[in-house]
Amino acid sequence: WDGLSEHTRAVLHAADVVFGSARQLSTLPIAAYRLRRWPSPLLPALRSSIEEFDGRWVCVLASGDPMFHGIGVSLAREFGASRLHVIPAASSLSLACARLGWAVHATTTVNIVNAAVTTISPALFDRAHVLVLSRDEHTPAHVVELLRRSGFGGSSVTVLEQLVNPAERLVNVTAAPAGYPVGDALNVVAIECVSDPTYQRLTRVPGLPDSAYSGDGQLTKSEVRSLTLSALAPAPGEHLWDVG
């Protein structure tokens, strides 16, 4: 609350109802009857939760920039941008890069809040800067384990917890030692990639090695897959059916 602008505080005080997480709502000096905690899972109930207060002034709390992998994207998709008034703050990407001295435009962001940790793999290459948006306090340990398994055991890993909050903490670890102690649930993981000499990289280009797939062994060989996909030249959002 102390870090909010006067304009933002005025908006919150004027709102008929304020939605947010338990952590966010606990920071507000606002009467409890005006506060609404998000249900879990959130997305299936998002529209009905907001429409319950149709015609009233609804305020939604977000961390950082709502339009950077945040609730603002879901609200715009569900209700249209014309119904929103977004008050952004610095994103977790900007804050993390500021702490680490990284260039924002040269840092790859991977969101695994609702995705498997292996989603990070295609972004890993020697000297890459990767910022992982975490699901919870266990995510850093999963990331460190993935790095060790993927041939990036020498990478520098920094866990940034509670950014711009009084409890902010940066923990520097290396992917090589075993495990990472459980910390705060509100965190992002910054990886400065260092590859092992013998690592086998998983890329986004066609022709992943056969070992990257699990199954019964009935798999079109890498060279054929590479040539086929190159000829088809798929674009983002398109769907390919492999019928055989």
Q: Could you describe each region identified by the protein language model?
A:
Residues 55-58, 126-218:
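A contiguous loop/helix-start segment that scaffolds small-molecule binding in enzyme catalytic cores
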Residues 1-87, 94, 117:
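Class I S-adenosyl-L-methionine
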Residues 12-16, 32, 127-128, 186, ...:
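Short, well-ordered alpha-helix to beta-strand connector turns
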Residues 237-244:
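Conserved class I S-adenosyl-L-methionine
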Residues 219-236:
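Conserved alpha-helix/loop element of class I SAM-dependent methyltransferases that forms part
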Residues 10-11, 52-53, 79, 100-103, ...:
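Solvent-exposed alpha-helices and their adjacent loops that cap or buttress functional pockets
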Residues 17-19, 59, 108, 131, ...:
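Conserved beta-strand elements of the Class I
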Residues 92-128, 135:
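Short, glycine-/small-residue-rich phosphate/pyrophosphate-handling segment
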